[in-house]
A protein has these predicted regions:
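Extracytoplasmic "Venus flytrap"
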Residues: 48-69, 91-98, 120, 190-199, ...
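Extracellular/periplasmic periplasmic-binding protein-like sensory domains
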Residues: 257-334, 412
Length: 414
């Protein structure tokens, strides 16, 4: 963990009084605000969240947002940021791209020192302004366009590139899963035509071209976002051995495919875990059985130090609740979000709360690393702007109605 979060803090040797979750304490048009004010002579440090509460991403954000709120309260309760209180303000774009820049401006005008975002395309839209203003942007998403100038030097992705995940999973399947006495497996790919889908498709096609003895890519489809009944694509891929299908679009495809009586094994990505509840309700465990995905965290049933800490944290702020109660988005985003607060903590330690600015946050960000038992390598450098540097492979199991680990942590295949 970071400076204050390992040792005594990680082992929760601090006083473990049960705390009530700070809910939205101020409501204004298109915005939400919570967190401490500047009590006791402390400097108020404002964190902005540019997101989608009421649009298509709203259900997922409803599960993710509490982890940000809880970490704000945790850092304030434990006074982990010297001489400072953290305040969280949020702007709801409803995933309307016309509101991305006004939302950024709204957060900036109210003093946000850094901005967290969950918006597809949001970073590409606001990063030129963030570069101009010196405000670091921390994104739950990653795509190549985020890392292109202008403004890319102020961008941190608190996840991992889909292209590296895809290549690493294919490499694992070829070495550890497929029986080549059956010949070269037929591979298919299906996704919506988003920046992430384009990146992932390019990575899969590149890997297959470089390794024709490992996979025969027989079909690769990008369809318009929102497609829910991909019957034509399902038929085209009916004879595949493996098919990449992820997130909401993957669930629609998998249901169409299974309902048509086809039998390929599905491959997924860590982001799929954020839609865990949706997959269960859409498909049920019988149709999900065998779905093989990468993960950035240990499954919550494991007695793993990283998983145990999240469960203890949940019990502190939501007594009696389990990770499953809180939702996959909460659990899956915990260490990603924690990284933002550890970077904030280090920046304030370096320059003082009264002197905190975007440059201090950026400087702390590029030096950040996390050494936590039970996790892959986490960290940034001046040139590497994605947080997580490895995955484990898991299989969704109808028998256990959970996820079964198939591998240790695997470094990425470039």
């Amino acid at each position: 963990m970071g400076k204050q979060m390992k040792g005594d803090k990680m082992k929760c040797k601090c006083k473990m009084a049960v705390a009530f979750l700070l809910i939205l304490v101020m409501l204004v048009p298109l915005s939400f605000s919570c967190g401490g004010g500047g009590g006791g002579g402390k400097v108020t440090v404002t964190v902005g969240f540019l997101t989608d509460f009421t649009g298509p991403g709203g259900p997922a954000i409803a599960k993710l947002y509490p982890v940000i709120q809880d970490l704000v309260q945790y850092y304030n309760d434990e006074e982990l940021i010297p001489d400072a209180k953290v305040r969280l303000i949020s702007y709801d774009t409803a995933m309307d791209t016309a509101k991305y820049i006004p939302g950024y401006d709204w957060l900036k005008e109210r003093g946000a020192k850094l901005i967290i975002t969950s918006l597809p395309g949001g970073v590409e839209t606001v990063k030129p302004f963030a570069g101009r203003d010196g405000i670091p942007i921390f994104s739950y998403l990653y795509d190549e366009a985020m890392m292109e100038p202008p403004g890319a030097e102020w961008v941190f992705s608190i996840t991992t590139p889909s292209k590296l995940e895809g290549k690493t999973l294919l490499n694992w399947v070829s070495k550890s899963h497929w029986d080549y006495t059956q010949g070269v497996p037929k591979l298919g790919f299906y996704d919506w035509e988003t920046s992430d889908g384009i990146d992932r498709q390019a990575a899969i096609e590149e890997y297959c071209q470089a390794h024709p003895d490992e996979f025969d890519l027989v079909g690769s489809f990008l369809v318009p976002s929102g497609t829910m009944s991909p019957t034509g694509e399902a038929q085209e891929l009916k004879d595949c051995d493996y098919i990449f299908a992820i997130n909401t679009q993957g669930a629609y495809f998998m249901k169409t495919y299974r309902d048509s009586g086809y039998h390929a094994q599905f491959l997924g990505a860590c982001s799929t875990f954020g839609f865990y509840e949706f997959f269960k309700s859409m498909l049920g465990w019988e149709k999900l059985d065998g779905y093989t995905t990468t993960m950035l965290l240990p499954w919550w049933d494991e007695e793993n130090a990283a998983a145990v800490f999240i469960k203890e944290f949940i019990d502190r702020y939501h007594p009696g609740k389990s990770p499953e109660d809180m939702g996959a988005s909460y659990y899956g985003a915990f260490y990603d979000t924690l990284a933002v607060f550890e970077i904030l903590q280090q920046a304030v330690t370096d320059v003082g709360a009264a002197n905190l600015d975007g440059q201090a946050l950026r400087d702390a960000g590029v030096k950040y690393s996390l050494d936590q038992a039970g996790l892959p390598e986490y960290g940034f450098t001046d040139t590497v702007r994605y947080l997580v540097h490895g995955v484990a492979v898991y299989e969704w199991s109808a028998e256990s109605e959970g996820l079964a680990r198939l591998s240790d942590w695997i470094p990425f295949i470039e």
